[in-house]
Each structure stands twice: as C-alpha cells, then as structure tokens.
C-alpha cells in the first residue's frame, strides 16, 4: 500500500522518510548534543576545519556535515560541495582525479568560506588512496576543507587524523528515537499502538535511519504499526520468544529453553541474530546483578566464537548449558 499521499512526489513514487525528514539545520539534529554544539559553533563562526566524524551507522554523521555545509555555503552549495561515498570510490584514482580537480576549481565564495569535500564511509578507502588524500589536504588547505565520515576513526591513517578535528557520535537513546518517530507518525498520519513503536526502537538499536526505514516499511506493508507487524517486516527473533528462553534457563528448565532455541534456529534466523537479541534481552532482564554479569560474559564469549565462524546450533546450545551452570552455581550455598 502507498505510504501516504503526502509522501508521494510522483506517480507511484514514495520518497523515503529517512530523506524526507532529514534535518536541514545543525540545530535540528537529534541526539549527540556535544557533537552538535561543536558543529553549531563552526556554523556560527564560519571557520570550518577539516573534520572526521566517527560513530555507528544512523547516528547523524552524514546529515550533520550536509547541514553544516548548507549553513556555511547557502546558495553556493551545489558548486562548492563535492559528495563522494568512499566505499564505492575508494581507489587512488578518485583522489588524483575527482578530488584534485574539484580542489583546483575556482569558485567565488564569501570571505572566510571554503569549498567542502564530503567523503562518506572514508574508513573503507584503501591505504594508498588515504596517503594521496593526505597530500591533497595539505596542498589545497587554503581553498578546500575535507569532512570524512566513518564508523571507526582507527581505520583512518594517522597523518590524516592529525590534520582533522575529530567529532565522535554515539548511538541514540530510545527516548531520542521515540521523539523523532512520534513527529513522523503525526506528519504521515500513521495508525499505531505504543507497543509497535517500542518494537521499532528495539529493532533499530540506536540507529535512527533503521528506525525510520522500519517504520515506513511496516506502514507500507500492513498500514498499521503494531509489534507483530514490525517483527514480520524486520525479520528479527521476537524478543518475547528470546525472553522466554532466558526465563526457562533461570527456572532450571534447560530442555524447554533448548526447544525454544531450536524453534528460532529452524525459522532460519542466523546464530548472530539470535545471540545479539539474547544479549540485549539479558542486559535489560530483571535478575541479580552478579548473575547478569556472568550471563553477559558467557554470551560475549559465545558471540566471539560465532563471529570467528563457528556459528552452529551446537554453539547456541552450549551457551544455554553454560548459563544453566552459572545459574545452578549461584543457587548453591
């Protein structure tokens, strides 16, 4: 079903809500108050340094730099900004050709303003491309500023890091995501129940982009946002099912817990999906603190083994066995 008449911009085309509701001003960006306040100072003073914006996906890195560039350059944005996704354009030729040619281009800008090169997913650039970029940043420092968005700043070579101001972003809180979702559902007239939005927040895990995409997908597919519809669309292990597994472990019902795990595994969920949901359920489960710490430790070790490639039903059952042993040990006098 079409999302809403307000979303349509052409026949049969629905604009993604993640683009439609992307903030155009730095002050409107949700969460990461410290990072946003630093960018607001840059927007006000107009003296933009080279920047590295580092943090998890969907936390506002690209949106922040786009909004900053719009505020700094105004009507000159189109001719004074070069946007590249470094995961596609990641080789040394891009730096030597596209970026260098843009840096050499003459653009008339107000005093104190510079051209801006935005490199998204810069941590996927090859080492050779980063070395070439370092030299380009140096040579054209009078006319061009560079903004690099990445998930982990450690993958950016030291010479580039030393030439940039580092702005760190963190995952958004549940309340911050909820606030934005309520704005969108009101604007798009989306019928929902509170449990549906809670499910979207759970599946997003601090990622605003994921939250908006899940909201739009659920509304497009079912025209109503409730818990059941959200988990059908997002195709993640249902947290209530996983919660039952944890409860059965705590109640020393190991066989029933294994049966519940087998059901999830047979539905086609990967061990990574199951253990990630399990970890988040344990983290928020009401149990003794020392027990929760031990459960999280064992889950972390199992996750590490699965990430190393040993992803099997046997590993997951082994984890439940260890959690049961931890529980029995805690009960012993």
Swiss-Prot record:
InterPro entries: AAA+_ATPase, ATPase_AAA_core, DNA_pol3_clamp-load_cplx_C, DNA_Rep/Repair_Clamp_Loader, P-loop_NTPase, Rep_factorC_C, RFC_lid. The modification N-acetylalanine is found at residue 2. Its main location: nucleus. GO terms for molecular function: ATP binding; ATP hydrolysis activity; DNA binding. It is found in: Nucleus. SUPFAM superfamilies: P-loop containing nucleoside triphosphate hydrolases (SSF52540), post-AAA+ oligomerization domain-like (SSF48019). Transmembrane segments: none annotated. CDD domains: AAA (cd00009), HLD_clamp_RFC (cd18140). ATP binds at residues 55-62. Heterotetramer of subunits RFC2, RFC3, RFC4 and RFC5 that can form a complex with RFC1. This is Replication factor C subunit 2. It comes from Arabidopsis thaliana.
């Amino acid at each position: 079903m079409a999302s809403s008449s307000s979303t349509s911009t052409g026949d049969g085309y629905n604009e993604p809500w993640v683009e439609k509701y992307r903030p155009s001003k730095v002050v409107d960006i949700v969460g990461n108050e410290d990072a946003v306040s630093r960018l607001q100072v840059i927007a006000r003073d107009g003296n933009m340094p080279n920047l590295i914006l580092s943090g998890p996906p969907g936390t506002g890195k690209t949106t922040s730099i786009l909004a900053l560039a719009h505020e700094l350059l105004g009507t000159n944005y189109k001719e004074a900004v070069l946007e590249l996704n470094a995961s596609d354009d990641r080789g040394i030729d891009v730096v030597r050709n596209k970026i260098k040619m843009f840096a050499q281009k003459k653009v008339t800008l107000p005093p104190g303003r510079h051209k801006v090169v935005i490199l998204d997913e810069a941590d996927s650039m090859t080492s050779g491309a980063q070395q070439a970029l370092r030299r380009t940043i140096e040579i054209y420092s009078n006319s061009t500023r560079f903004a690099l968005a990445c998930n982990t700043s450690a993958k950016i070579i030291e010479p580039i890091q030393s030439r940039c101001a580092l702005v760190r972003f963190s995952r958004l809180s549940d309340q911050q995501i909820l606030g934005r979702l309520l704005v969108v559902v009101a604007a798009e007239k989306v019928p929902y129940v509170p449990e549906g939005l809670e499910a979207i927040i759970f599946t997003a895990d601090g990622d605003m982009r994921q939250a908006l995409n899940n909201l739009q997908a659920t509304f497009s597919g079912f025209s109503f946002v409730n818990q059941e519809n959200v988990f059908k669309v997002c195709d993640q292990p249902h947290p209530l099912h996983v919660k039952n597994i944890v409860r059965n472990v705590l109640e020393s019902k190991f066989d029933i817990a294994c049966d519940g795990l087998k059901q999830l595994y047979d539905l086609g969920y990967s061990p990574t999906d199951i253990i990630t949901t399990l970890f988040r359920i344990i983290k928020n489960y009401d149990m003794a603190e020392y027990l929760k710490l031990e459960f999280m430790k064992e889950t972390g070790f199992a996750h590490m083994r699965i990430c190393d490639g040993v992803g099997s039903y046997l590993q997951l059952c082994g984890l439940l066995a260890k959690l049961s042993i931890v529980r029995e040990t805690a009960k012993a006098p």
